[in-house]
């Protein structure tokens, strides 16, 4: 599974965004971010 647009992600990569959709994990704090 990979995170879709608007999904949460973790900065350590355990919850990653879909690279194939060119989504990046934009940090919200020191631990989590959002796929945009």
UniProtKB/Swiss-Prot annotation:
Entry superkingdom: Eukaryota
Keywords: Disulfide bond, Knottin
Positions of disulphide bridges: 2-18, 9-25, 17-35
Domain notes: The presence of a 'disulfide through disulfide knot' structurally defines this protein as a knottin.
Function: Sialidase inhibitor. Competitively inhibits bacterial sialidases, but not viral sialidases. Does not inhibit glycosidases or proteases. Has no antitumor activity.
Protein name (Swiss-Prot/TrEMBL): Asteropin-A
Organism in which the protein naturally occurs: Asteropus simplex (Marine sponge)
